[in-house]
């Protein structure tokens, strides 16, 4: 399946760093109801250096707290003006984590019990899990795409057909957000835990370690890594012999899911650059692979060699330098993490 779909539901885009006044005015719109975010695993974090008067706060939870507080004041604490918040960051129970971080800002900024109560009673922050491989801008195919469209579009985004969004929320929220009626694979469930553990461990975990191993070997696309004589065996070993051994679900179910993941990795229409996966590799490894490494060590009494190799490749990548083919290695992460790893 290879198709083009025009996305026509976005009315505008705002940069809070250059348009903060307009960004804050969003909170003044009475019809505003939903906030959806994806700022990667590194995004939901508390930064005590953020101030209420910052325009804007540097962290995402800080910006969101500013927006919520402005809405609270604008509508004088009207509980019908609360917001429903769906974080999509790949953190287990991301909604709980985001909520905890907002509470930290409420305390840090002394925003008061009235606002805290309004946030607790009028707003909902729900844990979610997203599953879709989205490589981004299709540089290799953009000329053919523009020819087919008959106009220039510099915001083309490539994605696989498969998609799943699991939201841990009550049915009242599902009624307000009836995505299924739009033909979308969105599930409202009592717990996202089983979906999260399986997906993060057997899709994102392999992604995170295969990418630096492949890149340092001169392989730039996930599909090519899977089909590589050596790296392909490495990916299979990490998935089936290491990570799968750390899960408590039926083995036949896990094997089917893992084989489906490999089929998605091999998608001939999706050129998923490993460098796009390696953004913020260290926090990704911490959430996607380190739990499996620890569980494997506890159960087997030895370290999983494939996951350790992946970590070594990440550290090597963060040190920068030049690949064997002459390509410059340019890592991207928080400065404190990059400086630490360069010193190893």
Q: How would you label these PLM feature ranges?
A:
Residues 1-344:
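Substrate/ligand-engaging "lid" and interaction regions
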